Amino acid sequence: MHLFIEVIAAFFTALSFGVLFNMKGKNLILAGIGGSIAWFSYKFLLNMGVTENLCFFIATVCFAIYCELCARIYMTPATTLSVCCLIILVPGYGIYNTMYSVLTNNYIKAVEYGVSTLSCASSIALGLVFITTVFRKVNLY
């Protein structure tokens, strides 16, 4: 039940960012579904015991494939969908902990949090670049 509530919250978060980016109609729903896919993939894998970086990578691959397919089916830019889905996975808590540790002069913890956050962000970037490159090189028509 807890995962279901988180997935619904991810849907509305992605949908809200779609509103912020002036998306309209069915694109808002597509963005919300993509955010739900991203968060469900991440949390499901995390609960299965997969490492956090791999969870971020696989969740990014899942929503990036979804966004690329929706972009081709509904003739909409994949970038706008991807950005709305990407917001869900941004490691904000790690960034907060890094800055908090710096401000409290706990530099060893700051480096630990910073490296962890940077590796999570890198996993997200690699997943998105990987799928985008594959879809640009492979012609589905």
Q: What do these predicted ranges mean?
A:
Residues 84-97:
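Hydrophobic alpha-helical membrane segments
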Residues 1-72, 76-78, 97-141:
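Alpha-helical transmembrane segments and their membrane-interface boundaries
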Residues 77-85:
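Membrane-helix boundary/juxtamembrane motif in polytopic membrane proteins
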